[in-house]
Amino acid sequence: MNLISTVILIASALSLILILVSFWLPQLSPDYEKLSPYECGFDPLGSARLPFSLRFFLIAILFLLFDLEIALLLPLPWGDQLSNPTLTFMWATSVLALLTLGLIYEWLQGGLEWAE
């Protein structure tokens, strides 16, 4: 067998084993909590239009900004192969500095505090 067939065989066997274990394990000790659906703490029968905390929205926006930062800076190690790597690293440093200053400003303004 070649390498691709071996990898496919191992992946299929591992998937089958995990599927069988996932069906077998819950039957060992069933109780009420394991049999009930996961509800995330929200009332499923109440109104869906509940007020949403602005703190959660702010944390989500900060997470998206820093996630975008990681996505932009991830290919940075290959930046030394460009014609002008110094300029690339200067731009990356300026992006990091700008986001760090924004985070410090948000922290000093109290936007990251949960209790008021």
UniProtKB/Swiss-Prot annotation:
Membrane topology summary: Multi-pass membrane protein
Main localization, broad class: mitochondrion
Enzyme class, spelled out: translocase
This protein's GO CC annotations: mitochondrial membrane; NADH dehydrogenase complex
Places the protein is found: Mitochondrion membrane
Listed GO MF terms: NADH dehydrogenase (ubiquinone) activity
Membrane-spanning residues: 3-23, 56-76, 87-107
Gene3D superfamilies, A to Z: NADH:ubiquinone/plastoquinone oxidoreductase, chain 3
EC number(s) on file: 7.1.1.2
Reaction(s) the record says it catalyses: a ubiquinone + NADH + 5 H(+)(in) = a ubiquinol + NAD(+) + 4 H(+)(out)
A family per Pfam: Oxidored_q4
Role summary: Core subunit of the mitochondrial membrane respiratory chain NADH dehydrogenase (Complex I) that is believed to belong to the minimal assembly required for catalysis. Complex I functions in the transfer of electrons from NADH to the respiratory chain. The immediate electron acceptor for the enzyme is believed to be ubiquinone.
Family assignment from sequence similarity: Belongs to the complex I subunit 3 family.
The protein's name in its UniProt record: NADH-ubiquinone oxidoreductase chain 3
Organism of origin: Gadus morhua (Atlantic cod)
Taxonomy of the source species: Eukaryota, Metazoa, Chordata, Craniata, Vertebrata
